[in-house]
Amino acid sequence: MSDENPLQPPWLNAPPVDPYPYEESHDLRTGPKLHPALDGLLPYVGVWRGRGRGGYPTIEDFDYGQEIRISHDGRPFLCYESRAWLLDEQSRPIRPAGREMGWWRPVLAGDRATGEWEALMTTPTGVMELHLGKRTGTQLEFATDAVVRTPTAKEVTAGHRLFGIVEGALLYAQEMAAVGHGLTPHLSARLIRVGG
């Protein structure tokens, strides 16, 4: 008869695990090779920083700074991370603002990208959005297919996002349907590459 306790988890006395062994990179000169299905979004990979303007019918307009990091680990998806902070009239930081994490995934036919994309985006405010979209040149356009909210999250029902690389800068515009309003312009920004 074995000395193992069937109620004891198998990992309880296992040796420690080494750090995560796979590299993720926002710099195409280092790290893993970009998956061929991501070639159409190669210009997006990097670290971007800049400023934007936001507003909505239920809030006052505001200026913000933002950093977006788009990275990969060699598999056919991009990791998207955004953090923003409010700016005063002299462009000084006031406080942290929106944060978002997500993944951009090409729709594949075999191993080849079709030009259609899926994006999964989550926020710490309890909203998760599933976007479907298309890439045209260096432009990427997404619209929500579904929005899931925690019971305490703000009522967000739809979104639309347009990203583009214009003269080396990352530009985007975001519309949102929330708290009883239809799709309405919410955010727009211009960011320059600061890494990658």
From Swiss-Prot:
The record ties this protein, via InterPro entries, to:
Calycin (IPR012674), Nb(III)_bact/plant (IPR022939), Nitrobindin (IPR045165), THAP4-like_heme-bd (IPR014878)
Pathway annotation from the record: Nitrogen metabolism
What reaction is this protein's catalytic activity?
A: peroxynitrite = nitrate
Q: What CDD domains does the entry give?
A: lipocalin_heme-bd-THAP4-like
Claim: Ribosomal protein is one of the keywords in the record = no
Give me the comment on cofactor binding.
Answer: Binds 1 heme b group per subunit, that coordinates a highly solvent-exposed Fe(III) atom.
List, alphabetically, the SUPFAM superfamilies matched: Lipocalins
Question: Which Gene3D superfamilies does this UniProt record tie to the protein?
Answer: 2.40.128.20
User: What Pfam families does the record point to?
Assistant: THAP4_heme-bd (PF08768)
Region (Disordered): which ranges? 1-29
Q: Where is this motif: GXWXGXG?
A: 46-52
Name the coenzymes or cofactors required. heme b
- Record keywords, A-Z: Heme, Iron, Isomerase, Metal-binding
Q: Where is the composition biased (Pro residues)?
A: 7-19
Q: Write down the top EC class of this protein.
A: isomerase
User: Which E.C. number(s) belong to this protein?
Assistant: 5.99.-.-
- Answer yes or no on keyword Isomerase: yes
* GO molecular function per UniProt: heme binding; metal ion binding; peroxynitrite isomerase activity
Query: For binding heme b, which residues are annotated in this chain's numbering?
Result: 186
Q: What is known of its domains?
A: Forms a 10-stranded antiparallel beta-barrel structure able to accommodate a hydrophobic ligand in its interior. In fact, this fold hosts the heme group, which is located in a wide surface cleft.
Give the protein family: Belongs to the nitrobindin family.
Q: What does this protein do?
A: Heme-binding protein able to scavenge peroxynitrite and to protect free L-tyrosine against peroxynitrite-mediated nitration, by acting as a peroxynitrite isomerase that converts peroxynitrite to nitrate. Therefore, this protein likely plays a role in peroxynitrite sensing and in the detoxification of reactive nitrogen and oxygen species (RNS and ROS, respectively). Is able to bind nitric oxide (NO) in vitro, but may act as a sensor of peroxynitrite levels in vivo.
> How does this chain assemble?
Homodimer.
The record, for PANTHER family, names: PEROXYNITRITE ISOMERASE THAP4 (PTHR15854:SF4), THAP4 PROTEIN (PTHR15854)
User: What is this protein's name?
Assistant: Peroxynitrite isomerase
